[in-house]
C-alpha cells in the first residue's frame, strides 16, 4: 500500500496544480485572477472578475481536485489518515501549482472537496459555517477562517485518524490567509 499511497499523493498534487481559475480566465479572456481583484486564484475572486458562471465552474473544479484523490484512496483501501495526507497533497497543489509557477489560490474549495471525500458530515458543517459567516459578515476570508478549523472537533470525534492531516490542512489555509487576517484586523478586508 505504500507505493499506492505515493502514487496517489503525486496524482493529488498534480491534479491540485490544475488551477481552474487561471485556466478559465485564459479561455474566457478574463483578467488573470492572481493579478486582479483580490489576487487570489479561486472562485470568490472569479465571481468578482468574470461572473457567476465561471465562478461556479471554478468552485466545482477546485472541489473535485480535493474529492477525486481522496475517493480513489478510499476505493483502493487506504486508511483515513492516508486519505487525509493525500488530500493535503491536493491542497498543496492548489496553493503551489507546478504548472503556474507555484502561484495558486488559498485552497478552501479544494479542502472542502477533501472533507467531502473523507467525512461528508464535516464537509457539510464547513459549508454551512462558511455560508452563514458569509451571509452575516459578507467577508469570504473570514468565512474560510471560521469554517475550516470548526471541522476539527467533529473529525477528532468521528475520524480521529484523519485529525493530524486535517489539522495540517487547516494550518495551511490559515497561513495562506495571513494577509487577509492583517486586513481584517485593520478593517481593510474586502466585502461582498
UniProtKB/Swiss-Prot annotation:
EC category name: transferase
Topology in membrane: Multi-pass membrane protein
Predominant cellular place of this UniProt entry's protein: membrane
Keyword annotations: Cell inner membrane, Cell membrane, Lipid biosynthesis, Lipid metabolism, Membrane, Phospholipid biosynthesis, Phospholipid metabolism, Transferase, Transmembrane, Transmembrane helix
One cellular-component annotation, GO: plasma membrane
Function description: Catalyzes the transfer of an acyl group from acyl-phosphate (acyl-PO(4)) to glycerol-3-phosphate (G3P) to form lysophosphatidic acid (LPA). This enzyme utilizes acyl-phosphate as fatty acyl donor, but not acyl-CoA or acyl-ACP.
PANTHER family named among the record's database cross-references: GLYCEROL-3-PHOSPHATE ACYLTRANSFERASE-RELATED, INNER MEMBRANE PROTEIN YGIH
Protein name: Glycerol-3-phosphate acyltransferase
Organism: Pseudomonas syringae pv. tomato (strain ATCC BAA-871 / DC3000)
This protein's encoding gene: plsY
Amino acid at each position: 500500500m505504500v507505493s499506492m499511497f505515493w502514487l496517489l499523493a503525486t496524482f493529488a498534487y498534480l491534479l491540485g496544480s490544475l488551477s481552474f481559475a487561471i485556466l478559465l480566465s485564459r479561455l474566457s479572456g478574463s483578467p488573470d485572477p492572481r493579478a486582479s481583484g483580490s489576487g487570489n486564484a479561486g472562485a470568490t475572486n472569479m465571481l468578482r472578475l468574470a461572473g457567476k458562471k465561471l465562478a461556479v465552474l471554478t468552485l466545482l473544479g477546485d472541489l473535485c481536485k480535493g474529492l477525486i484523490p481522496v475517493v480513489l484512496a478510499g476505493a483502493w483501501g487506504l486508511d483515513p489518515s492516508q486519505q487525509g495526507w493525500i488530500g493535503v497533497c491536493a491542497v498543496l497543489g492548489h496553493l503551489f501549482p507546478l504548472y503556474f509557477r507555484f502561484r495558486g489560490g488559498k485552497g478552501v474549495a479544494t479542502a472542502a472537496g477533501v472533507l467531502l471525500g473523507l467525512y461528508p458530515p464535516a464537509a457539510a458543517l464547513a459549508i454551512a459555517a462558511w455560508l452563514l459567516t458569509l451571509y452575516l459578515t459578507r467577508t469570504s476570508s473570514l468565512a474560510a477562517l471560521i469554517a475550516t478549523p470548526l471541522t476539527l472537533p467533529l473529525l477528532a470525534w468521528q475520524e480521529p485518524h484523519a485529525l493530524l492531516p486535517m489539522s495540517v490542512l487547516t494550518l495551511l489555509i490559515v497561513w495562506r490567509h495571513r494577509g487577509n487576517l492583517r486586513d481584517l484586523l485593520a478593517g481593510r478586508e474586502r466585502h461582498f
